């Protein structure tokens, strides 16, 4: 299996292995899929984000990606939430923070599992625009997005689509 540069949407019914595909590409399962990305950096946004409860979002994100995440987080409307703890944020806000973290990681492969599932239409639209900008600015990077979200499917930002 090969993945072209740009954005690939992976769709299909629940339970067919879309999340498993992302985990395999990320190297979590020790499968032959790991050889596809061997020697390249991957960054994964899982469906459920896990945070350190006693650290602010600013502390957590700065600890791993430096300051690059802030510009992305600001584009996602999060600047007033930098010094909040995870449990003070909605699931959608947490999802946008994780997305800013992953995109700031400068990985060769960006693996996103349902990245807009907790977002309202306005923030989903902003996120889709961010994906489109990423695609244009990082022509050699690969972004694999697992989704059921019609907004992403109709957003016309992807280069390729795989239906499982």
Located regions from the model:
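Q-loop/switch helix immediately C-terminal to the Walker
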Residues: 48, 53-69
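Walker B catalytic motif
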Residues: 85, 114-115, 119
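Conserved ABC ATPase signature
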Residues: 85-89, 93
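Helix N-cap at the start of a conserved alpha-helix in ABC-type nucleotide-binding domains
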Residues: 121-123
């Amino acid at each position: 299996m090969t993945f072209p540069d740009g954005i690939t949407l992976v769709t299909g019914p629940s339970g067919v292995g879309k999340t498993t595909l992302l985990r395999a590409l990320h190297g979590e399962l020790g499968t032959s899929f790991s050889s596809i990305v061997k020697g390249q950096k991957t960054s994964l946004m899982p469906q459920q984000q896990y945070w350190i409860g006693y650290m602010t979002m600013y502390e957590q994100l700065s600890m791993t990606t430096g300051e690059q995440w802030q510009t992305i987080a600001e584009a996602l409307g999060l600047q007033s939430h930098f010094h909040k703890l995870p449990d003070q944020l909605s699931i959608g806000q947490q999802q946008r923070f994780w997305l800013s973290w992953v995109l700031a990681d400068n990985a060769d492969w960006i693996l996103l599992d349902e990245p807009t599932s907790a977002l309202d239409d306005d923030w989903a639209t902003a996120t889709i625009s961010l994906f489109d900008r990423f695609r244009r600015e990082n022509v050699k990077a690969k972004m694999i997005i697992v989704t059921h979200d019609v907004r992403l499917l109709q957003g016309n930002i992807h280069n390729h689509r795989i239906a499982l």
